């Protein structure tokens, strides 16, 4: 038996980063393209762009940037830090939930 936990980071009551946005940023980092990242994540380009902009507005910091005269997109140091924090928290939560299930099953 498994216990599943869905969580995300919010600021001022609005979503900043969850699993989907983390995956989107990682796909941008790997491929350098929002269009390709959106395809990989199974969402439209417009939806991907909207999610990024909403997160950036809530944070007050850019998560992606483009270089003048160049095609493509790169994630910012802020985005890299958020991805790292997300994975760190997620790993700890997964271990904790597994431990809770294990202890609960032993008690019965």
Which role does the model predict for each range below?
Residues 1-13:
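Short, Lys/Arg-enriched N-terminal segment that forms or immediately precedes the first helix
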Residues 28-38:
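Short helix-boundary/capping micro-motifs
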Residues 51:
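Residues within the DNA-recognition helix of helix-turn-helix
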Residues 57-62:
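Residue cluster at the C-terminal edge of the helix-turn-helix DNA-binding motif
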Residues 66-89:
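Basic, amphipathic "hinge/linker" alpha-helix immediately C-terminal to the N-terminal HTH DNA-binding motif
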Residues 82-104:
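Alpha-helical linker/hinge and terminal dimerization helices associated
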């Amino acid at each position: 038996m498994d216990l599943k936990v869905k969580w995300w980071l919010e600021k001022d009551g609005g979503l900043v980063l969850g699993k989907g946005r983390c995956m989107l940023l990682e796909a941008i980092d790997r491929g350098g393209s929002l269009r390709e990242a959106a395809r990989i994540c199974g969402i439209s380009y417009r939806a991907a762009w909207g999610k990024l902009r909403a997160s950036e507005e809530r944070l007050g910091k850019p998560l992606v940037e483009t270089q003048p005269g160049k095609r493509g997109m790169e994630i910012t140091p802020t985005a890299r830090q958020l991805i790292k924090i997300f994975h760190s928290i997620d790993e700890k939560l997964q271990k904790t939930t597994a431990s809770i299930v294990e202890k609960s099953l032993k008690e019965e």
